[in-house]
Regions:
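C-terminal interaction modules of eukaryotic adaptor/scaffold proteins
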Residues: 480-481
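Extended, charged low-complexity segments
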Residues: 488-490, 497-500
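Substrate-recognition/cap helix-loop segment adjacent to the acidic, metal-dependent catalytic center
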Residues: 414-426
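Short, surface-exposed ligand- or partner-binding patches at beta-edge/loop junctions that are enriched
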Residues: 463-464
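PLP-dependent amino-acid enzyme catalytic core
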Residues: 1-399, 407-413, 432-441, 452, ...
Length: 513
């Protein structure tokens, strides 16, 4: 049964401010449309001044659909509002309901609108979000559950690694659930299923499972057809409506978008098919291993319900490093757009250079969340990976060696082995606890102990872990904050001296404190 009082609040605080269909004088139209801005001249200038490419003789037109102007600043408010409206209508959400969802940021931020109607939202985040995203989640009164527990593999433990990570992460989730006021007994009674989901890194179904056992509402954005319908019935119609006002039609355009859940590409593809019997959506992906604003790579998209490449007009892989100068140009021109928009515009530029054409690029969010990374464009610090021989040869250059790992720590014999192998005095080796390491890897701030060690250093600082992966991650986190460090390739287990030792002689389970 619908909660009429809650629906009234929702319509007043949310629905009235987002794009939706309304009938006026018997004619259905979209209200609260976001701006559709002609970017043609600016893209011509960008191509010439930034990439030394002349597209002035190409027959093309390009618009930006600026959804960064929506409440909470992103396109994700469209499906979020559609799903919540339906959930209140059908009685799945009522006063006192808690909403939980897996998100890479923007959908969770959109759920922050629920605080305006007295509904609590919890966001499960499973990737290292940029500081600006965490800030907006917190400012939106979202309860954040951070599932990041990156663990560097330990030799001899590879087969057990996924379960080790799952158990460590489950303990982390349990403590956060308690902090949020949930009964730990319910969690403990379902621990096997939870660890299985975590071992598979299946955060999407973890959100669904927690909703089930705690009687919460999960929007299920990755599997909810209302996500796709929001773009099929509103976004597509809205763009077409605006083009018609300019004497044009979406029939003569293609849309360029990136892939998060597949809702935008899926809904707009359906609109093109139903209205114009054509494939009209070009979907853009970053390369594998490149993390761009929560946008999925092809590998991460494959297998999701709404990843349907057979519906697309084109599928493109764009290196964000190539698109960064374009992002800088457009933002400095006064266009508020985020990282995903740069990928789309760069892809559109490539297509226009080859064949011309007309495009609408989805500007899914603005630059504010990514401001810190944006300011580093053209001034990037890159960590150096160094071998044991490199360090030993230049031992006098290194003033601090910092161990970083969330599961293991060197014993006294391991510390002595590090000092001897690297030719560095043992007093220069810093061993923070596991909690401090996790705080550093979360990317939010540099823990006091590590910050102090770095500030005291009069030379280079070297990050060391078990096998080299976690230390490189830590060095990258520090680089993002403008701090230069090196990372030891292969870690402690890659040192020649360690190969003659039993691992348990030099390494032990890390303490949290």
């Amino acid at each position: 049964m619908s909660d009429s009082a809650l629906m009234e609040k929702f319509e007043q605080e949310v629905w009235s401010k987002v794009p939706h269909r309304e009938e006026k004088d018997g004619i259905a139209q979209i209200v609260n449309a976001t701006p559709l801005i002609d970017l043609t001249d600016d893209l011509k200038e960008c191509a010439k001044t930034v990439y030394d490419v002349d597209i002035s003789d190409k027959d093309f037109k390009i618009y930006g659909k600026f959804d960064n102007t929506l409440p909470t600043g992103s396109i994700k408010v469209r499906p979020a509002a559609n799903i919540i409206h339906d959930a209140i209508t059908t009685g799945k959400i009522s006063s006192g309901t808690t909403v939980i969802e897996a998100t890479s940021g923007n959908f969770g931020i959109a759920l922050g609108l629920l605080s305006k109607i007295g509904v609590t939202a919890i966001a499960l985040v499973s990737r290292k979000l940029q500081e600006g995203v965490f800030k907006e989640l917190r400012n939106g009164n979202i309860r954040i559950m951070d599932l990041d527990m990156d663990i560097c593999p330990a030799p001899g433990m590879e087969d057990k690694q996924d379960m080790l990570v799952a158990k460590a992460t489950a303990a982390n989730v349990r403590s956060q659930m308690i902090e949020l006021g949930f009964d730990p007994e319910t969690f403990d009674n379902n621990i096997s299923d939870i660890e299985t989901l975590l071992a598979k890194k299946d955060i999407i179904n973890l959100a669904k499972f927690l909703a089930k056992i705690y009687d919460l509402f999960c929007p299920e954005q990755y599997d909810n057809d209302l996500n796709v319908d929001a773009h099929r019935t509103v976004t597509g119609v809205e763009i077409d409506q605006q083009l018609h006002e300019n004497g044009e039609s979406l029939e003569n355009y293609n849309i360029v978008c990136t892939f998060g859940t597949g809702g935008t590409s899926g809904g707009l593809s359906k609109y093109f098919d139903e209205q114009y019997s054509k494939k009209g959506v070009h979907v853009i992906f970053p390369p594998d291993q490149q993390d761009v604003a929560g946008i999925r790579t092809v590998g991460n998209a494959d297998g999701l319900k709404y990843y349907n490449p057979e519906l697309y007009a084109g599928k493109h892989q764009i290196d964000f490093e190539q698109a960064k100068p374009l992002l800088k140009f457009m933002v400095e021109k006064g266009h508020d757009m985020g990282e995903s928009s740069a990928l789309e515009l760069y892809a559109a530029l490539q297509m226009i250079y080859k064949n011309g054409g007309n495009y609408v690029v989805m500007i899914c969010d603005g630059i504010d969340k990514y401001r810190k990374n944006f300011e580093k464009i053209g001034n990037t610090i890159t960590p150096t990976q160094v071998s044991q021989q490199d360090v030993a040869t230049n031992a006098n250059d290194y003033d601090k060696v910092i161990w970083v790992h969330t599961q293991y720590t060197p014993r006294e014999e391991g510390i002595e082995l590090l000092a001897k192998s690297l030719g560095i005095d043992k007093s220069k080796i810093i061993i923070p606890n596991a909690r401090t390491a996790q705080q550093l890897l979360s990317g939010q701030q540099v823990p006091e102990e590590i910050d102090q060690a770095l500030q005291e250093s009069k030379g280079k600082s070297l990050m060391v872990c078990m096998a080299g992966r976690t230390s490189l991650m830590a060095a990258n986190v520090l680089a993002e904050k403008g701090i230069q460090t090196d990372s030891l390739t292969g870690g402690i287990t890659g040192l020649p001296e360690s190969k003659t030792k039993d691992l348990s002689q030099i390494i032990e389970q890390a303490s949290q404190f």
